[in-house]
UniProtKB/Swiss-Prot annotation:
Alphabetical list of HAMAP family matching this protein: EF_G_EF_2_B
Listed InterPro entries: EFG_II (IPR041095), EFG_III (IPR009022), EFG_III/V (IPR035647), EFG_IV (IPR047872), EFG_V (IPR035649), EFG_V-like (IPR000640), EFTu-like_2 (IPR004161), G_TR_CS (IPR031157)
Function recorded in the entry: Mitochondrial GTPase that catalyzes the GTP-dependent ribosomal translocation step during translation elongation. During this step, the ribosome changes from the pre-translocational (PRE) to the post-translocational (POST) state as the newly formed A-site-bound peptidyl-tRNA and P-site-bound deacylated tRNA move to the P and E sites, respectively. Catalyzes the coordinated movement of the two tRNA molecules, the mRNA and conformational changes in the ribosome.
Gene from which this protein is expressed: mEFG1
Binding positions for GTP per the UniProt entry: 51-58, 118-122, 172-175
Extent of the transit peptide: 1-32
Keyword flag Transit peptide: yes
Domain called tr-type G: residue spans: 42-319
Organism: Drosophila virilis (Fruit fly)
Protein known as: Elongation factor G, mitochondrial
Gene3D superfamilies in alphabetical order: 3.30.230.10, 3.30.70.240, Elongation Factor G (Translational Gtpase), domain 3 (3.30.70.870), P-loop containing nucleotide triphosphate hydrolases (3.40.50.300), Translation factors (2.40.30.10)
Length: 747
């Protein structure tokens, strides 16, 4: 058979002379003028690149920026030149070789504007992924060909499901020893419950990785020339034709199950065209009923250009995704409104602030425009505070570079300066429509540490750093504990808090000392407890009078991190204007329990009846009555302590399996699954966070430094009786008290 071979030269070699000029520029970035041109909505993609840590997200983004001409030179995450990847702009990111903050950029591929957000892979920075996915229309889920589906992959998958984000899967690192993309596909189906199939196959793995087979167009693609810029199309290798036919048939079967149009052709045994398959891939990907799986190795410059084609071909444009706002007016039911994604500016501007950052010119607020158009000089209103803001400057972002634009349209991601707001706020040009968008899910912190500046003279800088970081990151909390006279910071893990401590020293010249990590326990009721409390105080003049009757009860286990207040009063025994005072009192008292001093959670407060005085009743009196009622429930109710449970994943050589599982069991871990492949094993377990401190050094010593683990927050669960006794005892000792005479959970 005569082989028909042709070379596809991308536009990159044609730019070589231009790139030389670009390299001479101080910033090293190509001109952004052509990238900032406004495109029709069909020519826009907003995507995120998400994965488990060390799966190659940032390296992949670096290749995308290079192949699309956005940057002139590629740099590695841990390169010898110490420059670091473009999207890792923070010095700490370059030094550690990890992504800490999500970074935004935009580029062009085949006349389509692609807005990209590269997100962190470490579980401690999961809120960065959360708020990125909230504003994106599609995502690339990167999986390691060796590690497969790992703990943070599961988290990212849940986040994509929460915001209904369609995704492509890219199995990266085909060049690594032990890579097995077929095993990864199997894990996607079993662990992530994805209806997934290959649309590409690797031509060789590990050191034999030569190129890929495109199953849709039935051809082989080889990446040649400097940096793999030249694509050579060829016939599928002889030894892969049978496998390619089988995998293509498997792809069609999976697609037919998810797509009605293709399913009819399949049942009628009619021939499929390439256009039929591509159209079905796009429909099912947008509906999240099918996940196309692509393969490659970003580090070795293979598979990136076909991935860019797939982003354009299969992921939705902003007009194909339904985005909702809500009309909220007092005394009326909340109404749902579908926003208009057309880029014509006919409807009022609607945008969502999804990230805050302190820049050189003040606070930088990242927004996504969902409706209308916003121009320099316009006035916008914060839907939460109703404050007016005049737009003096509009920028689009390329990592840490800001590029000025005059206007943004629906579907664009941009930033503003000097806007006082919180993450998740809605902005609009028409405040009279009372519309707001759904905010961003923020997980509760699970670890606390004492923190103090090393030098007293640094207190001002310390305060500035804390104020900035708590505003930027909703999972980073700060408070002063009056009982132990300590300043505490809380976050998603030890690394999370260590990074902020290092940033305080680097960015504010304020070295700090962190104490030992403390677990964020919670207190909850075991069963319902009634209350009937009268607050009455008379000391001359108008007094205080408030009576409240009701019930406090536990919420279901899947809601045990929440607090719920329910007003069930009928009539005027408790006037409606005083009910907010009762709720305020309940929430204030929930900040510190009496068993261990930790917050209450998983509790519902039901206000059922009460009494008031025509003169002496006030909101303050009812707030104090709530304080008294909860103290009553503290004394009469049965309470228990909840602790955070972590999903732990350990990988090590199989000869250490017994030792690893033994150590997890000693730490009160419950083994939920094991896997083994080519001399290595992976064990999955649920372990209390309180028992995980110091595990890293134990794992290193027991596996000769070859084992590694990851963990992520799963849920809160009742702690063991001996742990509860220990926590209560430590709290009582810190308060200078004996054991409390309080009912605890009966075991």
């Amino acid at each position: 058979m005569t082989l028909i071979t042709r070379v596809l030269n991308s536009n990159l070699p044609l730019r070589l002379s231009a790139l030389k000029t670009v390299r001479q520029l101080q910033c090293g970035y190509s001109s952004h003028a052509k990238y900032a041109e406004h495109k029709p909505i069909e020519r826009i993609r907003n995507i995120g690149i998400s994965a488990h840590i060390d799966s190659g997200k940032t390296t992949l983004t670096e290749r995308i920026l290079f192949y699309t001409g956005r940057i002139a030179e590629m740099h590695e995450v841990r390169g010898k030149d110490n420059v670091g990847a473009t999207m890792d702009s923070m010095e700490l990111e370059r030094q550690r070789g990890i992504t800490i903050q999500s970074a935004a950029t935009y580029t062009l591929w085949k006349d389509t504007n692609i807005n990209i957000i590269d997100t962190p892979g470490h579980v401690d920075f999961t809120v960065e992924v959360e708020r990125a996915l909230r504003v994106l229309d599609g995502a690339v889920l990167v999986l390691c060909a060796v590690g497969g589906v790992q703990s943070q992959t599961l988290t990212v998958n849940r986040q994509m499901k929460r915001y209904n984000v369609p995704c492509l899967a890219f199995i990266n690192k085909l060049d690594r020893l032990g890579s097995n993309p077929y095993r990864v596909l199997s894990q996607m189906r079993s662990k992530l419950n994805h209806n997934a199939a290959f649309i590409q196959l690797p031509i060789g793995v590990e050191s034999n990785c030569k190129g890929i087979v495109d199953l849709v167009q039935e051809r082989a693609i080889y990446f040649e020339g400097e940096h793999g810029m030249d694509l050579r199309l060829d016939e599928i290798p002889q030894d892969m034709r049978v496998e390619s036919q089988e995998r293509r048939q498997e792809l069609i079967e999976h697609l037919s199950n998810a797509d009605e149009t293709l399913g009819e052709l399949f049942l009628e045994e009619k021939p499929f065209t390439e256009a039929d398959i591509k159209a079905a891939l796009r429909r099912t990907c947008i509906k999240r009923t099918f996940t196309p799986v692509l393969v490659g190795t970003a580090l070795k410059n293979k598979g990136v250009q076909p991935l860019l084609d797939a982003i354009i071909d299969y992921l939705p444009n902003p007009g194909e995704v339904e985005n909702l706002a809500y009309i909220e007016q007092e005394g009326k039911e909340k109404q749902q409104v579908v926003l208009n994604p057309a880029r014509d500016g006919k409807d009022p501007f609607m945008g969502l602030a999804f990230k805050l950052e302190a820049g050189r010119f003040g606070q930088l607020t990242y927004l996504r425009c969902y409706q209308g158009v916003l121009r320099k000089g316009d006035n916008i209103f914060n839907a939460r505070t109703n404050k007016k803001v005049r737009i003096a400057r509009l920028v689009r972002l390329h990592s840490n570079q800001m590029e000025d634009v005059n206007e943004v349209y629906a579907g664009d991601i941009f930033a503003l300066f000097g806007v006082d707001c919180a993450s998740g706020d809605t902005f609009t040009t028409n405040p009279k429509n009372h519309m707001a968008m759904e905010s961003i899910f923020v997980p509760e912190p699970v670890v606390s540490m004492a923190i103090k500046p090393n030098n007293t003279k640094d207190r001002d800088n310390f305060s500035k750093a804390i104020a900035r970081f708590t505003k930027e990151d909703p999972t980073f909390h700060f408070y002063f504990d009056n009982d132990v006279k300590e300043t505490l910071v809380s976050g998603m893990g030890e690394l999370h808090l260590e990074i902020y401590a290092q940033r305080m020293e680097r960015e504010y010249g304020c070295p700090v000392t962190l104490g030992k990590p403390k677990v964020a326990f919670r207190e909850t009721l075991v069963g319902p407890c009634e209350f009937d409390y009268l607050h009455k105080k008379q000391s001359g003049g108008s007094g205080q009078y408030a009576r409240i009757i009701g019930l406090m009860e536990p919420l279901p286990p899947n809601q045990n991190t929440l607090l719920e207040f329910v007003d069930e009063t009928v009539g005027t025994n408790v006037p409606k204007q005083f009910v907010p005072g009762v709720e305020k009192g309940f929430r204030e008292m929930s900040e510190r329990g009496m068993l261990s001093g930790h917050k209450l959670s998983g509790v519902r407060f039901r206000l059922q009846d009460g009494g008031h005085h025509i003169v002496d009743s006030s909101e303050l009196a009812f707030m104090l009555a709530a304080h008294g009622a909860i103290k009553e429930v503290f004394q009469n109710g049965s309470w228990q302590i909840l602790e955070p449970i972590m999903l732990v994943e350990v990988t090590a050589p199989e000869e250490f399996q017994g030792a690893v599982m033994g150590h997890l069991s000693k730490r009160h871990g419950i083994i939920t699954g094991t896997e083994g492949t080519e001399g290595w094993f992976t064990v999955y377990a649920e372990v209390p966070l309180n028992d995980m401190f110091g595990y890293a050094s134990e794992l290193r010593s027991s596996t000769q430094g070859k084992g590694e683990f990851t963990m992520e927050y799963s849920r809160y669960s009742p702690c063991l009786p001996e742990v509860q006794e220990q926590v209560v005892r430590q709290y009582q000792e810190s308060q200078g008290l004996g054991q409390p005479e309080k009912k605890k959970k009966k075991n």
